[in-house]
């Protein structure tokens, strides 16, 4: 059974929640095995804080309740839709299993409730360990992005070669191990691994952080 290890970088108390735990048991779709098969393999990240921002593209300016939690530049603001990077919540993932794909996706309620959509992407996690990257784009630039603590922000899924395999998601809580992992990750160059993000796992392309779990 594939195991995904992860740590919370922004706030150690942040935890990924199985999407199945957030769906009311009374919904009729919970009787569908196809629906349930995906839900138990999908996890939701929620906001650990209250947060708000607004964009003024004419002045290349972003007003924000916590500006230290944003990353952006002029190019991102001036794209057809502004793209802004949130540094929360942030998780670092690792697996020792081969050919496990990591899928980062938006959560449908953010477009309705929070005025943003998370930008999706995926890659072969077995070949590279990296932090989740929460880039968002605004739905309506004339409105603020307003996030309340506990609001869902994005979803992640993990795809093994056999899609019928269950996924074990294991959170690391030992602070020394967490710091060791974060330090090791920061010392590695992502550039060297980009050609392997979408390739099949081989011994020589195996993620370099396995020593942390020996």
Question: Language-model segments: which ranges?
Answer:
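Non-catalytic terminal segments and appended small domains
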Residues: 1-131, 137-214
């Amino acid at each position: 059974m594939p195991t995904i290890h992860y740590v919370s970088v922004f706030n150690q108390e942040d935890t990924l929640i199985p999407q199945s735990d957030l769906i009311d048991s009374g919904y009729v779709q919970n009787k569908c095995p196809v629906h349930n098969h995906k839900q138990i393999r999908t996890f939701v990240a929620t906001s650990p804080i209250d947060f708000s921002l607004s964009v003024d593209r004419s002045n290349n300016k972003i007003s924000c309740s916590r500006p230290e939690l944003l990353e952006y530049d002029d190019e991102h603001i001036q794209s057809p839709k502004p793209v802004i990077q949130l540094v929360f919540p942030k998780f670092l993932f690792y697996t020792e299993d081969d050919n496990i794909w990591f899928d980062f996706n938006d959560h449908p309620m953010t477009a309705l409730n929070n005025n943003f959509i998370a930008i999706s992407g995926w890659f072969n996690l077995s070949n590279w360990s990296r932090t989740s990257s929460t880039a968002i784009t605004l739905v309506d630039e004339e409105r603020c992005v307003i996030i309340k603590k506990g609001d869902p922000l994005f979803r992640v899924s993990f795809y093994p070669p056999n899609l019928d395999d269950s996924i074990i998601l294991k959170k690391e809580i030992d602070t020394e191990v967490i710091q060791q992992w974060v330090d090791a990750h920061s010392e590695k160059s992502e550039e060297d691994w980009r050609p392997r993000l979408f390739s099949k796992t081989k011994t020589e392309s195996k993620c370099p952080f396995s020593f942390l779990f020996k």
